[in-house]
């Protein structure tokens, strides 16, 4: 029953389609035969157009199918062409042996030629990737350095504190003509090449406390601040008149070492000298004052510390007459 109902519905659809495509005269004839308003369904001529298995071939004539489906020029022409062959993408040649799982692709490290300097420190990276470079300052604190890293030419301030640097070589600061401050506090420095600082004419502050130095190298004359506290400096490790030519030196900190005498003569520019906690037992008469210039006063030198030494300062009264204040230390 369902099949018969479906075939009947299909026949009606095809009949309607066929009627629309019939010639004008045939359509007019059929319209005249259709019942008008008010007609009774009882007089409706059934003819043989009703689809049934016996007249299926007569109702639908497929012999003129091309004529029935010809729309003339009403539809745009569609050009049918063959598809272009698909572009074949050859897989990249692999150097991995068959059956071997491929490893993750390796990333190419970007070039570092645009950094301040392309030199490589002992970490295998440019200095300004290991350290922090801000303008003319380089901060290399507490990164386990064992040597002075290559520095940008424009470096003026170097901070490499709390590392494991054991030696300063002559070439470590070569060509760094703008270097003003070097701070190597809390390292393991036991030796400095004699020419390591000599050509650094712009150097003002040299800060080397808490190392293992036993001697000082030749120092540039422009230094203003020298801090070598908490080392192993001996008097024999400081060259005679080492500070005389340093006409800009204002602060000299040599406390907590192994000095047995005051290194002198000291420059007139000096404002503060700390020598506490050494092994000093005596001093020269001219270490602070010129014994022949009794009218001269060293007004700038107001801070002298000799406490923590075995010396009895009361035994050398003529050594302080030019000072605005007496040194701090033992007078009994």
Swiss-Prot record:
<keyword id="KW-0433">Leucine-rich repeat</keyword>
<feature type="repeat" description="LRR 3">
    <location>
        <begin position="202"/>
        <end position="223"/>
    </location>
</feature>
<dbReference type="GO" id="GO:0031012">
    <property type="term" value="C:extracellular matrix"/>
</dbReference>
<keyword id="KW-0325">Glycoprotein</keyword>
<dbReference type="GO" id="GO:0061975">
    <property type="term" value="P:articular cartilage development"/>
</dbReference>
<feature type="repeat" description="LRR 6">
    <location>
        <begin position="300"/>
        <end position="320"/>
    </location>
</feature>
<keyword id="KW-1015">Disulfide bond</keyword>
<feature type="disulfide bond">
    <location>
        <begin position="289"/>
        <end position="322"/>
    </location>
</feature>
<comment type="similarity">
    <text>Belongs to the small leucine-rich proteoglycan (SLRP) family. SLRP class III subfamily.</text>
</comment>
<dbReference type="GO" id="GO:0005576">
    <property type="term" value="C:extracellular region"/>
</dbReference>
<comment type="function">
    <text>Inhibits angiogenesis in the vitreous humor of the eye, and therefore represses neovascularization. Binds collagen fibrils. May be involved in collagen fiber organization via regulation of other members of the small leucine-rich repeat proteoglycan superfamily.</text>
</comment>
<keyword id="KW-0765">Sulfation</keyword>
<feature type="site" description="Cleavage; by MMP2">
    <location>
        <begin position="87"/>
        <end position="88"/>
    </location>
</feature>
<keyword id="KW-0677">Repeat</keyword>
<comment type="subunit">
    <text>Homodimer.</text>
</comment>
<feature type="repeat" description="LRR 2">
    <location>
        <begin position="178"/>
        <end position="199"/>
    </location>
</feature>
<feature type="site" description="Cleavage; by MMP7">
    <location>
        <begin position="32"/>
        <end position="33"/>
    </location>
</feature>
<feature type="signal peptide">
    <location>
        <begin position="1"/>
        <end position="19"/>
    </location>
</feature>
<feature type="modified residue" description="Sulfotyrosine">
    <location>
        <position position="139"/>
    </location>
</feature>
<keyword id="KW-0732">Signal</keyword>
<feature type="compositionally biased region" description="Basic and acidic residues">
    <location>
        <begin position="29"/>
        <end position="39"/>
    </location>
</feature>
<dbReference type="GO" id="GO:0030199">
    <property type="term" value="P:collagen fibril organization"/>
</dbReference>
<dbReference type="GO" id="GO:0001525">
    <property type="term" value="P:angiogenesis"/>
</dbReference>
<feature type="modified residue" description="Sulfotyrosine">
    <location>
        <position position="71"/>
    </location>
</feature>
<feature type="repeat" description="LRR 5">
    <location>
        <begin position="270"/>
        <end position="290"/>
    </location>
</feature>
<dbReference type="InterPro" id="IPR032675">
    <property type="entry name" value="LRR_dom_sf"/>
</dbReference>
<feature type="repeat" description="LRR 4">
    <location>
        <begin position="248"/>
        <end position="269"/>
    </location>
</feature>
<dbReference type="GO" id="GO:0060348">
    <property type="term" value="P:bone development"/>
</dbReference>
<dbReference type="InterPro" id="IPR003591">
    <property type="entry name" value="Leu-rich_rpt_typical-subtyp"/>
</dbReference>
<feature type="site" description="Cleavage; by MMP7">
    <location>
        <begin position="20"/>
        <end position="21"/>
    </location>
</feature>
<keyword id="KW-0272">Extracellular matrix</keyword>
<keyword id="KW-0964">Secreted</keyword>
<dbReference type="InterPro" id="IPR043547">
    <property type="entry name" value="Mimecan/Epiphycan/Opticin"/>
</dbReference>
<feature type="region of interest" description="Disordered">
    <location>
        <begin position="21"/>
        <end position="41"/>
    </location>
</feature>
<feature type="repeat" description="LRR 1">
    <location>
        <begin position="154"/>
        <end position="175"/>
    </location>
</feature>
<dbReference type="InterPro" id="IPR001611">
    <property type="entry name" value="Leu-rich_rpt"/>
</dbReference>
<feature type="glycosylation site" description="N-linked (GlcNAc...) asparagine">
    <location>
        <position position="312"/>
    </location>
</feature>
<feature type="modified residue" description="Sulfotyrosine">
    <location>
        <position position="65"/>
    </location>
</feature>
<feature type="site" description="Cleavage; by MMP13">
    <location>
        <begin position="114"/>
        <end position="115"/>
    </location>
</feature>
<protein>
    <recommendedName>
        <fullName>Opticin</fullName>
    </recommendedName>
</protein>
<dbReference type="GO" id="GO:0016525">
    <property type="term" value="P:negative regulation of angiogenesis"/>
</dbReference>
<feature type="domain" description="LRRNT">
    <location>
        <begin position="116"/>
        <end position="153"/>
    </location>
</feature>
């Amino acid at each position: 029953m369902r099949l018969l109902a479906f075939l009947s519905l299909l026949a009606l659809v095809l009949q309607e389609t066929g009627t629309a495509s019939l010639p004008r005269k045939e359509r007019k004839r059929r319209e005249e035969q259709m019942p008008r308003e008010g007609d009774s369904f009882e007089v409706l001529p059934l003819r043989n157009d009703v689809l049934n298995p016996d007249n299926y071939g007569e109702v639908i004539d497929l012999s003129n199918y091309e004529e029935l489906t010809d729309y003339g020029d009403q539809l745009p022409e569609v050009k049918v062409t063959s598809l272009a062959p698909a572009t074949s993408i050859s897989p990249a040649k692999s150097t991995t042996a068959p059956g071997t799982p491929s490893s993750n692709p390796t990333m190419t490290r970007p070039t570092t030629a645009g950094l301040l300097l392309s030199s490589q420190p002992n970490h295998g990276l440019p200095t300004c990737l290991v350290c922090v470079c801000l303008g003319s300052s380089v901060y290399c604190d507490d990164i386990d350095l064992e040597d002075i890293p290559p520095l940008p030419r424009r470096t003026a301030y170097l901070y490499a504190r709390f590392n494991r640097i054991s030696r300063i070589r002559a070439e470590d600061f070569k060509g760094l003509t703008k270097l003003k401050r070097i701070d190597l506090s809390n390292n393991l420095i036991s030796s400095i090449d004699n020419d390591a600082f000599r050509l650094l004419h712009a150097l003002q502050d040299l800060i080397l406390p808490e190392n293992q130095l036993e001697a000082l190298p030749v120092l540039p004359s422009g230094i203003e601040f020298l801090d070598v506290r908490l080392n192993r400096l001996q008097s024999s490790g400081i060259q005679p008149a080492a500070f005389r030519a340093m006409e800009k030196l204002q602060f000299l900190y040599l406390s907590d070492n192994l000095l047995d005498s005051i290194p002198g003569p000291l420059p007139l520019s000096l404002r503060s000298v700390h020598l506490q906690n050494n092994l000093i037992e005596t001093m020269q008469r001219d270490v602070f004052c010129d014994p022949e210039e009794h009218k001269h006063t060293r007004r700038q030198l107001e801070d002298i510390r000799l406490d923590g030494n075995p010396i009895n300062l009361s035994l050398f009264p003529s050594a302080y007459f030019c000072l605005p204040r007496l040194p701090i230390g033992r007078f009994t």
